[in-house]
UniProtKB/Swiss-Prot annotation:
Its EC number is 4.1.99.1. The keyword Lyase applies. Homotetramer. Signal peptide: none annotated. The gene is tnaA. Belongs to the beta-eliminating lyase family. The modification N6-(pyridoxal phosphate)lysine is found at residue 256. It catalyses: L-tryptophan + H2O = indole + pyruvate + NH4(+). InterPro entries: ArAA_b-elim_lyase/Thr_aldolase (IPR001597), Beta-eliminating_lyase (IPR011166), PyrdxlP-dep_Trfase (IPR015424), PyrdxlP-dep_Trfase_major (IPR015421), PyrdxlP-dep_Trfase_small (IPR015422), TNase (IPR013440). Pathway: Amino-acid degradation; L-tryptophan degradation via pyruvate pathway; indole and pyruvate from L-tryptophan: step 1/1. One of its GO terms (molecular function) is tryptophanase activity. This is Tryptophanase.
């Protein structure tokens, strides 16, 4: 059947506050044209991130009531640990309050000045945590990963030839190799098991550990089942286990593929690294059996890890994301292809060729989409990645607007509304203007930077979009 049916019933709802275009123009101006600065209740459809925005299941809510809040040795920790090891058989599982804390602890152990840490593509917090130690983050995605409309089943793969060349030339400077699954910066693109095995073989040759940044591990496994020869008859759970069998460690934000609102972990096989990690954890996060999380959160993660490998859920998840991508393509909106698992990525460089990269075309599109219909996405381009460690500015590899779809939150009609807003926006894309940054922090500037349009009338004179309602 053609209808995409959500494989769940809705038990609890939250009202959406509708706003007029005039209100949204005022609110985005007050937010200094940075969508991170908006109040969430002034957003109609929030596609800023899929991180921590999932709707939890009835079973997860029930799990909250079982949470044991003992400071040390909580049974909730041991249920959490068992759930992690059921999918990811690492020796040591160290909880953290979210993924970037796991990254910070790991980089504090392995990185430092003169180190290089390669990956297919590092996402923003990983890169920042690497650079905070004085190390260099190196991106080695395959060539197809740089071309938004290139059709490749595993565009998230790391370039094994370039990885081997780096390890051969500078292996003494490489403490770990990372793989981000799926590759968020590159469009939510998956990494094949063949590529994971190939990376592990190189790591073994040069005696370098392989660590997976595994926030969307289940989506990656589902893509493997659908696209990689020999895995069509394997269960997602089996594929997940095989993925992690080739790694020496992992960082994880539970706010993605553990279907919860907070949490993460660092998992390792190396005993010495684990001892150092737990010492750092006690210093900044908490005792090793809670790691900055309440026992109830550990319980919710344990349940979420069972639910995320349900193949009916994953089929719905991929189909709904694909539906949005295909509809935008029909409207003539260029997107990263094939459609990723957690988000649709708009190629703003192609859609708005009149706006130079350092005038931030994806940010321009993000602001216009919010003003048009109250939809919040996020720029993944030169605002996020253009600032270099020495303070200079260079265009990012791609200028993308990410529409990240929260798990189990929106229905098909919400997605149809997003499509309708794009239809209204595409007809006046030529009127959109570039932006400039007026205030920024030294790191991760996209979260708090202030911007302004180079032609304010392009933002504030258009007619109303699809929604015109008073709050």
């Amino acid at each position: 059947m053609d209808t995409i049916i959500e494989p769940f019933r809705i038990k609890s709802v939250e009202p959406i506050q509708l706003t007029s275009r005039a209100e949204r123009e005022r609110m985005i101006r007050d937010a200094h044209y940075n969508l991170f600065n908006l109040h969430a209740d002034d957003v109609i459809i929030d596609l800023l991130t899929d991180s921590g925005t999932s709707a939890m299941s009835a079973a997860q809510w029930a799990g909250l009531m079982q949470g044991d809040e003992s400071y040390a040795g909580s049974p909730s920790y041991f249920r959490f640990e068992e759930a992690v090891k059921d999918l990811m058989p690492f020796e040591h599982v160290i909880p953290t309050h979210q993924g970037r804390a796991a990254e910070r602890i790991l980089m504090g152990i392995v990185a430092g000045p003169d180190a290089k840490i390669p990956s297919n593509t590092h996402f923003d917090t990983t890169r920042a945590n690497i650079e905070a130690t004085g190390a260099e983050a190196v991106d080695l995605v395959i060539d197809a990963g740089h071309v938004p409309d290139a059709e490749h089943p595993f565009k998230g793969n790391i370039n094994l030839d370039r990885l081997e060349a780096l390890l051969d030339a500078e292996g003494d400077r490489v403490p770990i190799v990372m793989l981000t699954v799926t590759n968020n910066t590159g469009g939510g693109q998956p990494v094949s098991l063949a590529n994971i095995r190939g990376a592990k073989a190189l790591c073994d040759t040069y005696d370098v550990p392989l660590v997976l940044d595994a926030c969307r591990f289940a989506e990656n496994a589902y893509f493997i089942k659908q696209r990689e020869d020999g895995y069509g008859d394997r269960s997602v759970k089996e594929i997940v286990r095989e993925m992690f069998s080739h790694a020496d460690g992992m960082t994880m934000s539970a706010k993605k593929d553990a279907l919860v609102n907070i949490g993460g972990w660092l998992a390792l096989d190396d005993d010495a690294w684990a001892r150092k990690a737990r010492n750092q954890l006690i210093l900044t996060e908490g005792f090793p059996t809670y790691g900055g999380l309440a026992g109830r959160d550990l319980e919710a993660i344990a349940v979420g890890l069972q639910e995320i490998v349900d193949e009916d859920y994953l089929e719905y998840r991929m189909a709904s994301t694909r539906y949005l991508g295909e509809a935008l393509t029909e409207l003539g909106v260029p997107i990263v292809k094939p459609v990723g698992g957690h988000a649709v990525y708009i190629d703003a460089k192609s859609l708005l060729p009149h706006i130079p990269p350092l005038d931030y075309p994806a940010q321009s599109l993000a602001v216009a989409l919010y003003v048009t219909g109250g939809i919040r996405g996020v720029e993944i381009g030169s605002v996020m990645f253009g600032r270099q460690p020495d303070g200079s500015e260079e265009p990012a590899d791609q200028e993308l607007l990410r529409l990240a779809i929260p798990r189990r939150v929106y229905t098909q009609s919400h997605v149809d509304y997003v499509i309708e807003c794009f239809e209204a926006l595409v007809g006046r894309k030529g009127a959109l203007c570039g932006y400039e940054i007026t205030e920024e922090p030294p790191q991760l500037r996209h979260f708090t930077a202030h911007l302004r349009p180079k032609a304010p009338e392009a933002v504030h004179h258009e007619t109303d979009g699809p929604v015109e309602a008073s709050s």
